[in-house]
Amino acid sequence: MDKKKLNPLARFRGFIQAGATLLTNIHLPNFAKGTLYQGSGKYVCVPGLNCYSCPGAAGACPVGAFQAVVGSSKFRFSYYITGILILFGVLLGRFICGFLCPFGWFQELLHKIPSPKLSTKKLKPLRYLKYAVLLVMVVLLPLLAVNELGMGDPFFCKYLCPQGVLEGAIPLSLTNAGIRAALGKLFTWKACILLAVIVGNVVFYRPFCKWLCPLGAFYALLNKVSLFQMRVDTHKCVSCGACARACKMDVDITKTPNHAECIRCGMCMKACPTDAIQYKFGLGDKSNNEATKE
């Protein structure tokens, strides 16, 4: 395929991911100081999975912010947090996972480490675990499992999220003796999860995204209706199967162009010999294969 025809988003995705990670964690001097940014930016949720307690974090993690509201003794439905999540999802869907999520980029970098690689095609049922994590750990447990003051824990952040250890606990403990002294069994548990995720990513492609990420689960629910879509021109498609073989998210884009697991990474576009797959943004303009099905 002529590289000149490849969409710039797909061609420069790695640079976009790096830039998004830098902008999300722009307060770099705080890593050396061992302090957190506490400015007005922390009232704004970033689109990807990025820990609030990261020294460099410029904004709040949407998952953590949602749990904080749900687990509050003065719980009121948060139109802001829910609304901004829906806005992100309706505008971009899982494009956020593929381009704007710092932890997603971290997983892809790990997968580049030379090693035997294993397919996840036979493990597709595991993808439904992330919906259980979203429902149980992000919504139900913080809402229902409360203490005597009526406060609930942020269960996902506290017990499962590896990003919190990677971006928060480890950097802060390196510069703060008090934090190092306070590390206990919970940190050990979370560190083991992080280690498992790191090892898993070396051999599998983005397993946390596929199987456990509640933010990915939320965006997946809106992937088919998001304004940012994948389009397949069936007049150009020769049914060679190159796109399905290239997809590391185990999606056959010719059958389901906007599958819940599609992170819009563009690997299928790079593999297509006839330039039949493109990005589209906006209402209408359905792909030929979608129109044919109707």
What are these language model-derived features?
Residues 1-254, 260-294:
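Non-ligating segments of multi-cofactor redox enzymes
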